Every structure is written in structure tokens, then in C-alpha cells.
Amino acid sequence: MEEHRKRHGRRLDYEEKKRKRTAREAHKASADAQKIFGHKAKLHHARRHAEKVQMKKTLKAHDERNVKQKDDGAVKEGALPAYLLDRDGQKDAKALSSAVKDRRKDRAAKYSVPLPKVRGIAEEEMFKVIKTGKSKSKSWKRMVNKATFVGEGFTRKPVKLERFIRPMGLRMTKANVTHPELKTTFQLPILGVKKNPQSPLYTSLGVLTKGTILEVNVSELGMVTTGGKVVWSKYAQITNNPENDGCINSVLLV
């Protein structure tokens, strides 16, 4: 075949046919994925899930490639104030990370919260039943109707294993946090959901409803402890209904 190709060349429409065949591959793979079932389907979806996770990691690595990294050697000894020393160096960053993790373990109940009581939310209001299967006869999946928070490195489970679906349009990453003493509002990144008063399940899903205790990043506010350390995160309680307003309003717990 190689010899014949060298002597006579290719068909005139070879490149066009090859382009069309490549373009059809995605559609063919999609059709095959919808037809297969049983053990073969599980293997196929597991393989595709692994490919997508790897692709996501590769894209993230490409995005971070052009980000300028801070040079630790550029800052001379004594050039920074004492309360900013925790932000420099791998050793100090690790200590700060450990402090944040320890703080997350603290009970949210020790604060006197602005909203001590909230109304209960029925399961029918919280979840929408999703019919699945070829004849739409299975109803074990649920879609969350409320605003949610998922972490930055969140990856969805394979379709056959994902019970709770959290829509992209209802995922929140920032909250409007009001300082009760300063009477000032800041837009701060959310670090996690500490406690949802409705149910532990909603806490694990990261559902954001009225009265939920959030953990927000307050490093930009320049708050310092009595020991001179920068405060990295603090708790805040949601005071509105995010699914109705499209934003999160909360009060900082100081």
C-alpha cells in the first residue's frame, strides 16, 4: 500500500473524507454510549470519566502555566511586617493551612447567630425527582433546587453513580458578607459550608439556604489576631434566600 501510494498518490477527496470521518467520531461515540447497557456500559463510563478527569487536570495545568509565581528569595529578611510573615514560605504556608483546618473543626454552635431559628424545608421543595432509564421508569436521581457550593477541584461522579445533581446555574462561589460592627459589606470567596440547619445531608451536599453557616475567606480584610497572625477565614450566616435573589447575603460572626 505504501508503494502504491508513492507511485499513484491518494484520491482527490481523501483529505475531505478524512476530515468528515474525524468530525463524525464524536457523534458515533455518543450514539454508542447511549445504546450500550449493563456491565459493558459501566466499563465504558468509567473509562470516559477517567479521561475527562485527566483532561480537566491537563487544562488546569495549562492555565496555571502562565501564572507568575512569587519568588521567595526576592524578599529580604526584615522587609515584611511580622503579621504578614505567615504568608511567605512553604513551611509557614503549611502551618497556616493546619491552623485553618483546626479552625474548621470548631463547632459553629458556640456563636450567637443572627438567625437562631429558620423554617423547615420539605424534601419536595428541596429536590426534584429525575426520571432515568430507557423508558424513564427509574426515579432514584434527585436534582437540587436550591443554591449550592462545591469546591474548586470538584469533579462529578460518573452518570450511573451520581444520585444528587447540583446544577451549574445554582452554584455559588462568592457571598456578600456584612460586618456587624463596621456596618460595611464585602464580597468574599466561600471556602466551605460549615452547617446547614436543615439536615446533615444538605451540609454534605453544600446546599445554601437561609440560616446556613458558611466559612468565608477574610484574608483581604487584613484582620489580625491578638498574637499578630492574619485571620484567614471566619464564619458567616446566610440571611436571605439565595435561590430567589440570585446572590448570597450574610452576616459575619465576630
Curated annotation (Swiss-Prot):
Question: Region annotation Disordered: residue ranges?
Answer: 1-73
Task: Explain the purpose of this protein.
Answer: Involved in the biogenesis of the 60S ribosomal subunit. May play a part in the quality control of pre-60S particles.
Q: What is this protein called?
A: Ribosome biogenesis protein NSA2
Organism the protein comes from: Cryptococcus neoformans var. neoformans serotype D (strain B-3501A) (Filobasidiella neoformans)
- Locations of Basic and acidic residues compositional bias? 11-30, 60-73
Record GO cellular component, one term:
preribosome, large subunit precursor
Q: Which family does it belong to?
A: Belongs to the eukaryotic ribosomal protein eS8 family. Ribosome biogenesis protein NSA2 subfamily.
User: Which residues are connected by disulfide bridges in this protein?
Assistant: none
Q: Which GO terms describe its biological process?
A: maturation of 5.8S rRNA from tricistronic rRNA transcript (SSU-rRNA, 5.8S rRNA, LSU-rRNA); maturation of LSU-rRNA from tricistronic rRNA transcript (SSU-rRNA, 5.8S rRNA, LSU-rRNA)
Subcellular localization is given as: Nucleus, Nucleolus
